[in-house]
């Protein structure tokens, strides 16, 4: 089918796609059109990576936005929503869709700040957002949601994910219930039960294994590649590793390689080794460009991880994992797409939709550690096939190859049976679990989706879980447990079968925190206000909501919790991923707990209780935040806690979000600790001590420049407004444009830097950096 023959598209759209080189539709795309995707039909497209799923979504969205019957135009009020699983994908997709601005359409993107209603998005024709953001928009009453004409769910097979799957599942169920005549288009990898997904969404199904270029899969063993069609190709290993040999073989054919490993450490170690291979394949021009990229990488953060990544990139290799800063990952992805970086060693996060195809994919590690199982477990077929799907770049590669590595003949046969010849597993709903249901049940009640228990069960009947089971007993049982929990903690009230969210429950839903997180925070704030560190039953956990009326707060309750106490409080919530305790940490942090016991909020478990280790893990996480807020260098924090810059920033962002929730909840409880919580939040947000809060909040200043300015005598925003320009220029290390922007922000009467000399005393090499004072005491400096 030619794109010009697609029905339902306004004039000029077909010409646009033809100008982009799309004249003939791929078979799955043509089948989607035949099944009515441009005429309002719901559709599930279960097709391999790089087989044109995005174009199916674009055709659906553009036709849904348009109005006018046989001669459609973009003059209607419809809005298309594109849901992505990752923040990184949101920006990438929004950039793709900006090509449609030529038709007068506007594109918006939203991924953060879950408490806002997204009113600014109302004027957009296409909105790109994560499922969590869409869920929060519904909770906060975003009016434009009612104007949706089409919603696209990318990577919908991720409903199978324990953590994020329930949110995507419930969000789609909410949208279908809230918005009349909403078209739903779900894009999925090839899965074992695409028909069930289609039945859930009342959708047409396109289920295809077609790819635009050939994908050859196989296993390397000994000195040969064994392919799925029974053929073999010689690939000698020699004295090196299998991975290095496969990468070298790919380079000899001017191809690039993605290597998937099972841990961050393995990704970094693999990249270091592969740099010796890729470095020999670089031209002088490539070396120059890679040197510039390496310099950019070093500028992202002052950490060993940043330096190691830069060293690898300079030689044409890289690693990619969640411990990297966002800027690191973007630089690596762009350099790989530009064919400057020849090999990337990555954890499976890179297979989750980010557009980084390669000539050859190597799945080096097909097992990873599973803490629940207590050992190494094989990866799912679906996950490995997602990695396979990254092989082959349409328009750039004549074919793609995906290779597993075997160390024995038995393993060779096992890998063929387990992955090469196997079909992917069916996706299964993960909704019927109490942690998944807590937040969604509260939100359904708080937003008025349901006002009775029967109504709640009817709403949940629109989920994938309900489609996949004939036995609703488990879901009803777990839902009953959740309702009792929400009632006991004061988030909902039950009057017979009637359900109503309390004011606190309404707030918790809008804040988008797990109700258990909110209960933990509330208990801690109430405990602080009572100045109590023990419960009646020593060592037992009892929520404040269970203590009875005699434990009510005094009318003038006032408390000043410390930053460490607040950081520990939010680190104990299920919304925070705690740091693991390493060997020797238990004794060390037990000592810290005794030293700071008066600061720590809420009940403390006894040392012999199972909960004690999690409690200590939260204390370790809190100490990281306290070090950050005390201006300790990022490099020292990374070394002390064995984390990457991305981990630090992730913990900081989560802490800021949870402390904002704590501040709002303190106001709801009339506990007058709002200023203390706000200060702790601001300090962790900017990574500074109290005296720098005013300066660090100025755009383009940040923690290090704020400390330099303060040490040079510029101690406040008012001081900065009238500061000596040479001092400001020195504090930003001679960057005139940056100095001008800072002075313009604060309203300096003459921000220009022409002829201004930098005051070198304002930029000392040591002692003036954030955390640069090596004599500075820190919470982490204990024996």
Swiss-Prot record:
It is an enzyme of class 5 (isomerase). Pfam families: DEAD, Helicase_C, Helicase_dom4_arc. GO terms for biological process: DNA repair. ATP binds at residues 29, 47-54. GO terms for molecular function: 3'-5' DNA helicase activity; ATP binding; ATP hydrolysis activity; DNA binding. Its EC number is 5.6.2.4. SMART domains: DEXDc (SM00487), HELICc (SM00490). Residues 34-209 form the Helicase ATP-binding domain. Residues 744-783 are annotated as: Disordered. InterPro entries: DEAD/DEAH_box_helicase_dom, Hel308-like_dom4, Hel308_SKI2-like, Helicase_ATP-bd, Helicase_C-like, Helicase_Hel308, P-loop_NTPase, WH_DNA-bd_sf. It comes from the Archaea. It catalyses: Couples ATP hydrolysis with the unwinding of duplex DNA by translocating in the 3'-5' direction; ATP + H2O = ADP + phosphate + H(+). Residues 242-443 form the Helicase C-terminal domain. Keywords: ATP-binding, DNA damage, DNA repair, DNA-binding, Helicase, Hydrolase, Isomerase, Nucleotide-binding. A motif (DEAH box) lies at residues 154-157. PROSITE patterns: HELICASE_ATP_BIND_1, HELICASE_CTER. Monomer. DNA-dependent ATPase and 3'-5' DNA helicase that may be involved in repair of stalled replication forks. Belongs to the helicase family. Hel308 subfamily. This is ATP-dependent DNA helicase Hel308. It comes from Halobacterium salinarum (strain ATCC 700922 / JCM 11081 / NRC-1) (Halobacterium halobium).
């Amino acid at each position: 089918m030619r794109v010009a023959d697609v029905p339902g598209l306004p004039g000029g759209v077909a010409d646009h796609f033809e100008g982009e080189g799309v004249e003939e539709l791929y078979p799955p795309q043509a089948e989607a059109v035949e099944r009515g995707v441009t005429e309002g039909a719901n559709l599930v497209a279960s097709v391999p990576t790089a087989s044109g799923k995005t174009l199916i979504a674009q055709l659906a969205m553009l036709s849904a936005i348009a109005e006018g019957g046989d001669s459609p135009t973009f003059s209607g009020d419809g809005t298309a929503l594109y849901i992505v699983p990752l923040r990184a994908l949101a920006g990438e997709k929004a950039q793709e869709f900006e090509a449609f601005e030529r038709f007068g359409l506007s594109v918006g993107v939203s991924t953060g700040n879950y408490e806002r209603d997204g009113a600014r998005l109302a004027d957009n024709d296409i909105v790109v957002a994560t499922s969590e953001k869409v869920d929060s928009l519904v909770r906060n009453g975003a009016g434009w949601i009612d104007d949706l004409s089409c919603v696209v769910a990318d990577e919908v097979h991720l409903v199978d994910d324990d953590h994020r799957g329930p949110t995507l599942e419930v969000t789609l169920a909410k949208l279908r219930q809230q918005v009349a005549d909403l078209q739903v288009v779900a894009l999925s990898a090839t899965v074992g039960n695409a028909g069930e997904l289609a039945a859930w969404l009342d959708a047409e199904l396109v289920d295809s294994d077609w790819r635009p270029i050939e994908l050859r899969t196989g296993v390397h063993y000994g000195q040969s590649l064994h392919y799925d069609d029974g053929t073999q190709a010689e690939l000698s290993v020699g004295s090196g590793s299998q991975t290095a040999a496969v990468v070298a073989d790919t380079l000899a054919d001017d191809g690039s390689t993605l290597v998937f490993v099972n841990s961050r450490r393995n990704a970094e170690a693999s990249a270091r080794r592969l740099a010796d291979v890729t470095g020999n394949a670089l031209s002088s021009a490539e070396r120059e460009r890679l040197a510039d990229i390496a310099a950019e990488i070093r500028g992202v953060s002052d950490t060993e991880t940043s330096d190691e990544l830069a060293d690898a990139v300079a030689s044409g290799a890289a690693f990619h994992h969640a411990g990297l800063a966002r800027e690191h990952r973007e630089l690596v992805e762009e350099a790989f797409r530009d064919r400057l970086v020849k090999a990337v060693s990555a954890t499976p996060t890179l297979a989750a939709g980010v557009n980084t195809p390669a000539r050859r994919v190597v799945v080096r590690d097909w097992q990873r550690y599973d803490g629940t199982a207590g050992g190494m477990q094989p990866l799912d077929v679906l996950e490995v096939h997602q990695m396979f799907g990254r092989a082959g770049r349409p328009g750039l590669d004549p074919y793609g190859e995906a290779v597993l590595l075997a160390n024995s003949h038995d393993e060779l046969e096992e890998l063929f049976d387990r992955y090469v010849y196997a079909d992917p597993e069916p996706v299964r709903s993960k909704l019927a679990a109490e942690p998944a249901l807590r937040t969604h049940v509260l939100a359904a009640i708080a937003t008025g989706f349901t006002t009775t228990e029967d109504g709640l069960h009817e709403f949940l009947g629109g989920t994938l879980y309900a489609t996949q089971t004939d036995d609703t007993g488990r879901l009803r049982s777990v839902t009953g447990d959740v309702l009792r929990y929400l009632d006991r903690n004061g988030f909902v009230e039950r009057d017979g079968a009637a359900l109503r969210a309390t004011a606190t429950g309404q707030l918790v839903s809008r804040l988008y925190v797990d109700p258990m997180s909110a209960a933990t925070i509330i208990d801690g704030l109430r405990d602080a206000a009572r100045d109590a560190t023990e419960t009646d039953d020593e060592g037992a956990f009892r929520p404040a909501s269970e203590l009875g009326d005699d434990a009510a707060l005094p009318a003038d309750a006032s408390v000043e919790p410390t930053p460490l106490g607040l950081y520990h409080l939010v680190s104990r919530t299920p919304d925070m991923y705690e740091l693991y305790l390493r060997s020797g940490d238990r004794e060390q942090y037990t000592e810290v707990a005794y030293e700071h016991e008066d600061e720590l909020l809420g009940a403390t478990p006894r040392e012999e209780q199972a909960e004690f280790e999690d409690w200590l893990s939260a204390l370790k996480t809190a100490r990281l935040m306290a070090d950050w807020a005390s201006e300790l260098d990022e490099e020292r924090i990374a070394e002390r806690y064995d984390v990457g810059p991305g981990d630090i920033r992730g913990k900081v962002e989560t802490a800021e979000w949870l402390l904002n929730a704590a501040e709002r909840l303190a106001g709801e409880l009339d506990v007058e600790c709002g200023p203390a919580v706000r200060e702790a939040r601001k300090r962790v947000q900017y990574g500074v001590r109290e005296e720098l809060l005013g300066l660090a909040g100025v755009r383009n200043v940040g923690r290090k420049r704020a400390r330099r300015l303060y040490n040079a005598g510029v101690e406040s925003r008012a001081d900065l407004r009238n500061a000596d320009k040479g001092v400001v220029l020195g504090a930003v290390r001679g960057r005139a444009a940056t100095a001008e922007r800072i002075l313009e922000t604060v309203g300096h009467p003459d921000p220009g830097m022409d002829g201004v000399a930098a005051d070198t005393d304002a930029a000392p090499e040591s002692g003036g950096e954030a955390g640069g004072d090596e004599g500075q005491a820190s919470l982490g400096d204990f024996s």
